[in-house]
C-alpha cells in the first residue's frame, strides 16, 4: 500500500509548514503533497507542488483540490500548525475507507494545548449532522473518485460554505465514516470555552457566511426530500380549550439558592393585561432553594411543585409543569438563574402568538453577568430566522433562542424529551414541522453568566455527548419531514 494519497494543506510560510511536510513525505502512503497558497510568489518547499487559491473555504478551492487530485485518496489538512500521524495511522484510514467504500473518513486525535497532550475525540456522522460547525478534526481523507463526483454536483459558488456544501453532497450518495481511534496529533487553534463558541452563528460579522450555509443546507433538504414549503402550515385554534389563566411561567430548578429569588421576583413583577401564574418545579433541591421558594408562598400566583419521582431532567420538569391542570393557555420559560429584562415580557410574548398564529414563540435575550451588566456576546436575537425558511434553517443552527413559549395544547400533544440538554431544540423542530414559530426581536430576558452555569465550559466528552444527541434529534426530525412529504405526495 504505497503512494495512494495526495495531500493538500494550507501554506502560510515555509518555516511553519516545513515540519509537517517532512512528516508527510516520510509516510509511505503519501504520493504527493500540494501546498494551498494564497500568494502566487510564495516560497516553494522541496518535494511539494503548489496550488494558488484565494482562500481555504470557497467552492472554487474545493473544486481546485478535486481537479488536482490524481491518487486513489485525497487528504486535506485544515490547520497551519504541526501535524504528526500515529504509527501506521494513514494505512488504517485507507483500509477503513476501502473496506466500506466510504466517500470520506475522519478520526479521533490528540491535540497539544497549553503544553499538554490531550485527547480530542470526535463524534459519529449521522443523516441529521447538518450543523455547519460539525467537528471532523483537522484531517479528512476522501475517496478521490467520489470527491470528484460530488464536486461535479456543486452548482453554487460559495465563498465560505464550500467545505460544508461538499460534505452535504458527499453524504447524499456516500458514507461519511468516523474512525473512533486516535490516529494523529495536531495543535489546538480555538481555545474558547464551549459556552462562547455556541454563539458563533449568531454573530453579526458572520451573517454573510451563515447565509451561504443556510442556502447550502436548504438545497440539501430539497435533495433528500425533507424541505418544507413556507406555505405548508397548520392554523392554531386558540379557543380549542378553556384555561383559568392566560399564561404560565415555568421554572425548573435544582440547587440555585443564590439566584432563584431574583427569577421569582422578575416574574411576579410582570405587568400584563391578563391573569398569569408561575409554576416552579423544584427537582429535590438540597441547598436551601426549596426554602427560598417558600418565602413567596403568600402569593397565590406561585405554584411550587416538588416531584414525587427522582428521574426527571429539565425536560421532564417542563412536562410536569405544563401537564399540570393549573397551567395556562401559554407556557413561557425562564431559567432559574435568569431574569426577565422588562416587566412587559409576558404581555409581548403572548401577543406574538396571536399576531403570527404561532404554536411556539421565541424571544431575544442579552447575556449579562450576575449583576445584569452586559457581557460578550451581548444581544442574541436570532435574526437568521425568517418566516419563510426558518424551520428549514433550524437544522443547520444549534438553537432556537429564548425565552421560549408554547401554546399549551400543542405542547401537551408532543411533550419534550426528559433530558437536560437539547429538549427545547427538539420541541422547536417538532412544532415547526407543522406550525409557525413566532419571534420577538426585543430583549425579553437577561441570561446571566456566573460561576455555576451548567453550560459555560463543558469538557470535550460532555460537549460531544450533547452534540451527538442533538444530531440524533435532527436525524429523527429529518426522517419525520421526509415521511411527511411522502405522505403529502400520495394524497
Provide a role label for each language-model segment.
Residues 5-16, 27, 38, 247-259, ...:
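A conserved hydrophobic helix/loop-capping motif in glycosyltransferases and polysaccharide synthases
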Amino acid at each position: 500500500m504505497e503512494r495512494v494519497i495526495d495531500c493538500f494543506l494550507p501554506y502560510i510560510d515555509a518555516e511553519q509548514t516545513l515540519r509537517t511536510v517532512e512528516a508527510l513525505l516520510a509516510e509511505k502512503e503519501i504520493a504527493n503533497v500540494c501546498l494551498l497558497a494564497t500568494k502566487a510568489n510564495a516560497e516553494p518547499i522541496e518535494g511539494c507542488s503548489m496550488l494558488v487559491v484565494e482562500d481555504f473555504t470557497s467552492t472554487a478551492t474545493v473544486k481546485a483540490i478535486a481537479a488536482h487530485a490524481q491518487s486513489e485518496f485525497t487528504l486535506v489538512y485544515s490547520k497551519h500548525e504541526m501535524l504528526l500521524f500515529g504509527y501506521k495511522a494513514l494505512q488504517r484510514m485507507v483500509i477503513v475507507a476501502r473496506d466500506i467504500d466510504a466517500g470520506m473518513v475522519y478520526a479521533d486525535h490528540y491535540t497539544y494545548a497549553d503544553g499538554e497532550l490531550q485527547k480530542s475525540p470526535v463524534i459519529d456522522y449521522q443523516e441529521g449532522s447538518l450543523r455547519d460547525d460539525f467537528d471532523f478534526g483537522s484531517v479528512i481523507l476522501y475517496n478521490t473518485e467520489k470527491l470528484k463526483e460530488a464536486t461535479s454536483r456543486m452548482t453554487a459558488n460559495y465563498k465560505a460554505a464550500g467545505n460544508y456544501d461538499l460534505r452535504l453532497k458527499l453524504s447524499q450518495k456516500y458514507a461519511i465514516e468516523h474512525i473512533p481511534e486516535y490516529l494523529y496529533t495536531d495543535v489546538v487553534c480555538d481555545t474558547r470555552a464551549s459556552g462562547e463558541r455556541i454563539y458563533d452563528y449568531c454573530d453579526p460579522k458572520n451573517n454573510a457566511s451563515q447565509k451561504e450555509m443556510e442556502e447550502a443546507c436548504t438545497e440539501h433538504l430539497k435533495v433528500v426530500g425533507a424541505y418544507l414549503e413556507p406555505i405548508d402550515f397548520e392554523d392554531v385554534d386558540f379557543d380549542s380549550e378553556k384555561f383559568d389563566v392566560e399564561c404560565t411561567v415555568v421554572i425548573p430548578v435544582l440547587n440555585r439558592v443564590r439566584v432563584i429569588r431574583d427569577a421569582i421576583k422578575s416574574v411576579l413583577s410582570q405587568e400584563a393585561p391578563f391573569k398569569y401564574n408561575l409554576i416552579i418545579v423544584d427537582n429535590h433541591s438540597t441547598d436551601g432553594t426549596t426554602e427560598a421558594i417558600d418565602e413567596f408562598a403568600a402569593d397565590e400566583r406561585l405554584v411550587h411543585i416538588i416531584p414525587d419521582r427522582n428521574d426527571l431532567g429539565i425536560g421532564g420538569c417542563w412536562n410536569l409543569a405544563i401537564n399540570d391542570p393549573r397551567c395556562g393557555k401559554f407556557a413561557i420559560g425562564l431559567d432559574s438563574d435568569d431574569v426577565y429584562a422588562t416587566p412587559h415580557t409576558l404581555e409581548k410574548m403572548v401577543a406574538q402568538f396571536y399576531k403570527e398564529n404561532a404554536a411556539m414563540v421565541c424571544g431575544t435575550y442579552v447575556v449579562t453577568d450576575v449583576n445584569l451588566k452586559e457581557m460578550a456576546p451581548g444581544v442574541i436575537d436570532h435574526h437568521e430566522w425568517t418566516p419563510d425558511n426558518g424551520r428549514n434553517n433550524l437544522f443547520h443552527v444549534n438553537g432556537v433562542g429564548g425565552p421560549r413559549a408554547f401554546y399549551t395544547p400543542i405542547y401537551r400533544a408532543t411533550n419534550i424529551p426528559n433530558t437536560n440538554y437539547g429538549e427545547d431544540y427538539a420541541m422547536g423542530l417538532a412544532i415547526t414541522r407543522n406550525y409557525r414559530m413566532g419571534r420577538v426581536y426585543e430583549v425579553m430576558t437577561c441570561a446571566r453568566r456566573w460561576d455555576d452555569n451548567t453550560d459555560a465550559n463543558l469538557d470535550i466528552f460532555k460537549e460531544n455527548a450533547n452534540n451527538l444527541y442533538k444530531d440524533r434529534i435532527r436525524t429523527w426530525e429529518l426522517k419525520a419531514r421526509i415521511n411527511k412529504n411522502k405522505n403529502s405526495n400520495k394524497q
